Amino acid sequence: MAKEKFVKTKPHVNIGTIGHVDHGKTTLTAAITAVLAEKGYAEKRDYDQIDNAPEERERGITIATSHVEYETDKRHYAHVDCPGHADYVKNMITGAAQMDGAILVVSAADGPMPQTREHILLARQVGVPYIVVFLNKEDMVDDPELLELVEMEVRELLNEYDFPGDDVPVIAGSALKALEEAKEGKLGEWSEKILKLMEAVDEYIPTPERDIDKPFLMPIEDVFSISGRGTVVTGRIERGVVKVGDEIEIVGLRPTQKTTVTGVEMFRKELDQGEAGDNVGVLLRGTKKEEVERGQVLAQPGTITPHTKFEAEIYVLTKEEGGRHTPFFSGYRPQFYVRTTDVTGTITLPEGVEMVMPGDNVKINAELIAPIALEEGTRFAIREGGRTVGAGVVSKIIE
């Protein structure tokens, strides 16, 4: 009997596997699909299919990522897994794969390793809100006290980076053993542990708020003046809904102004409202063409504010990716391309960091020469004369 097609009626959640190299992230991804396939909830994907991830380009950066889909009783999941550590760094910073939560894989035989720490830090910096832990290779640990010790270490590490380490679900198991069971078509004790992990993911990682339910935000791409009607700004609505009659704010580059939406149109047709994902023209009451420009945003009043100083996590492109050939130092002044425009800014490196090499990722402080609508989680590119040399995400607003 053919397995039924995915029905998109269940709530959708994006997750991914993170953790140290060789702790079993890809094996776990394969095991989840294999075990759920036995229940008719997934198409089985072999380790090799997942590990030979196709390369994608996101803002000119080459990232190898595997995407798998599966379901549980409650939800539909899109799951990302990356073959190499550098791919994780790029993925998380560019937001190429937005994660609503992550499964942190830690080998019970080895305990937390350097990349375990680095991935937790990245998750904190780029705003991955929830982590569930899978202690893998449980079959290789004979002493139950050792398992408890590793669990304590992982919980302490999560606490260190402001995750609720004491409340995070920790499930022990063996991805390889579960995979072997599923291959033989019989789900035993190891497969049960995978199902238990997915139950924890179902329960602990909340369903994210949909873009359309968030407060309205639209980056301005273009401004036109239509005689007899006023000023129209165009752009793609990033989130929320805009209706005729709504009061909105124009934020960034200049003092914030309030205005009222007198029309919304798409493909030259009048609409009552535009929503997240729509490319629209928005007619603004009493706003002159000179008063608005590309790089500003339209937003629900009070939901986003202009800033010049922030902390960010950035990835610097390699020479092969078309980036710089040389390092840069504190005081470096590139352009920050935020949504639709470039703004010059100065980068200050953390104490003890002398310089940043192409291929590095680093936490920086930035100060822009003009205020831009920013919030934690805003993504940007770093450019020099129109060429992308880095990518980043705002981790904290300073002023």
UniProtKB/Swiss-Prot annotation:
- Name by which UniProt lists this protein: Elongation factor Tu
Recorded superkingdom: Bacteria
Listed binding positions for Mg(2+) are T26
Among its keywords, does the record have Transmembrane helix?
Answer: no
Region G2, as annotated, extends over 60-64
Identify its protein family. Belongs to the TRAFAC class translation factor GTPase superfamily. Classic translation factor GTPase family. EF-Tu/EF-1A subfamily.
**Which organism does this sequence originate in?**
Nitratiruptor sp. (strain SB155-2)
Q: By which gene is this protein encoded?
A: tuf
Q: Where is this region: G3?
A: 81-84
